[in-house]
Amino acid sequence: MKKQESIHTQLPGENVNTGFTASQIYYSTYQVSKLTSHLELHPRDYSSQIGLWKLLGRRKRLLAYLFKKNTGLYERVLTKLGIRGLKVKGR
């Protein structure tokens, strides 16, 4: 619970609505970090690797949606999380 509470405080506007795109990106980033640390300990856990790839794809789609709908919020989410942005043509 403590991790989720800290995630809620980092959300822009402290929006605790889990349907909010930014909060979904935060939660998926938290899951990615957990799976990444797990895979460092267990590099041959292929089912977890597949789950990580699916989660990364979902986060990428959410980031693309957020970029189209609200570019300012997209930039704030990237800076708060410290992740790379999407590869967008003409940018």
Curated annotation (Swiss-Prot):
Annotated signal sequence range: none
UniProt superkingdom: Eukaryota
Molecular function as annotated in GO: structural constituent of ribosome
Gene Ontology cellular-component terms listed: chloroplast; ribonucleoprotein complex; ribosome
InterPro entries hit by this protein: Ribosomal_uS15, Ribosomal_uS15_bac-type, uS15_NS1_RNA-bd_sf
Keyword annotations of the record: Chloroplast, Plastid, Ribonucleoprotein, Ribosomal protein
One Pfam family from the record: Ribosomal_S15
CDD domains per the UniProt record, alphabetical: S15_NS1_EPRS_RNA-bind
Main location, first listed in the record: plastid
Biological process, per Gene Ontology: translation
Stored Gene3D superfamilies: S15/NS1, RNA-binding
Record SMART domains: Ribosomal_S15
Location(s), subcellular: Plastid, Chloroplast
Family, similarity comment: Belongs to the universal ribosomal protein uS15 family.
Protein name: Small ribosomal subunit protein uS15c
Provenance organism: Adiantum capillus-veneris (Maidenhair fern)
Gene name, Swiss-Prot/TrEMBL: rps15
